[in-house]
Swiss-Prot record:
Positions of the catalytic residues: 153, 157
Catalytic activity: (S)-2,3,4,5-tetrahydrodipicolinate + NAD(+) + H2O = (2S,4S)-4-hydroxy-2,3,4,5-tetrahydrodipicolinate + NADH + H(+); (S)-2,3,4,5-tetrahydrodipicolinate + NADP(+) + H2O = (2S,4S)-4-hydroxy-2,3,4,5-tetrahydrodipicolinate + NADPH + H(+)
Keyword annotations of the record: Amino-acid biosynthesis, Cytoplasm, Diaminopimelate biosynthesis, Lysine biosynthesis, NAD, NADP, Oxidoreductase
Record's GO cellular component terms: cytosol
PROSITE patterns: DAPB (PS01298)
Family according to the record: Belongs to the DapB family.
The protein's name in its UniProt record: 4-hydroxy-tetrahydrodipicolinate reductase
Sequence positions that bind NAD(+): 8-13, 97-99, 123-126
Protein localization: Cytoplasm
Pathway: Amino-acid biosynthesis; L-lysine biosynthesis via DAP pathway; (S)-tetrahydrodipicolinate from L-aspartate: step 4/4
Length: 264
């Protein structure tokens, strides 16, 4: 059994993760970290499963009080990096679903993981379908280099563009030379109308109630277009990827950024 703690158990993703871990035959929920409800049990929190795992309001105290193999962090970009550093310092393997990590952050965290000889995973998106979308988009960009990305999320999402959109753009840029798209003399009547620029690609962010997580990668060529789209209808769609990450992180000794690097 892999012993797992969850940071951020009352968020929408956190609730699904706690439920999945509690029900999984190969995983054991041993604790959760929440800024409120210190000293309570998971089963005493609204909407969470009937688990006797304790609630801690501080990650460090949680890690020193329990035997934990993996920390699943589903908090915020501000907390994700700090929680990852604390977990690595305690020899606990972090699986982090928040975004906002810079290249320098990833380099430093990878160095720390390798010094400790343990695995770590940062996943901008846990939906396996979204990972396949990114892989398909990278392949398409070899032949259709004119591309724009449109990502759509619920209106409570704090960062824009999404980590998935940025990761998609990065993967495309590995096979596509930077090029300016659109008319060379085009103007914006409203600032930002053409989206954010990434090596000539435009990334557009939509935030509306009723959405969960959606992305289109739109390619254009002579006399044709190609659209690659993924939709997460609910947060259960992310749980197979969370479980895969927990199982995978136990067998690696470096930091992996992006589920596409652990899916064959």
């Amino acid at each position: 059994m892999i012993k797992v703690a969850v940071a951020g158990p009352r968020g929408k993703m956190g609730r699904e993760a706690v439920k999945m871990i509690h029900e999984a035959d190969t995983l054991e929920l041993v604790a959760v970290v929440d800024s409120k409800h210190d000293g309570m049990l998971v089963r005493q929190l609204d909407g969470l499963p009937p688990s006797d795992a304790p609630v801690y309001n501080e990650l460090e105290r949680c890690l020193t009080s329990q035997t934990i193999d993996v920390l699943v962090d589903l908090t915020t970009p501000a907390h994700g990096k700090r929680h990852m550093e604390i977990a690595l310092d305690h020899g606990v393997r972090p699986v982090v679903g928040t975004t906002g990590f810079t290249d320098e952050d990833i380099t430093n965290l990878r160095k720390k993981a390798e010094e400790k000889g343990i695995g770590a995973i940062i996943a901008p998106n846990f939906a396996i379908g979204a990972i396949l979308m990114m892989k398909f988009a990278q392949t398409a960009a070899k032949y259709l280099p004119d591309v724009e990305i449109i990502e759509m999320h619920h209106d409570r999402k704090l960062d824009a563009p999404s980590g998935t959109a940025l990761k998609t753009a990065q993967l495309i840029s590995e096979v596509r030379k930077a090029k300016q798209q659109g008319h060379p003399d085009e103007t914006e009547e409203l600032k930002g109308a053409r989206g954010a620029d990434f090596e000539g690609m435009s990334i557009h962010s939509v935030r509306l109630p009723g959405l969960v997580a959606h992305q289109e990668v739109l390619f254009g060529g002579v006399g044709q277009t190609l659209k690659i789209r993924h939709d997460s209808m609910n947060r259960e769609s992310f749980m197979p990827g969370v479980k895969l990450s927990i199982e995978t992180v136990m067998g690696i000794d470096t930091l992996v950024y992006g589920l596409e690097n652990i899916i064959e």
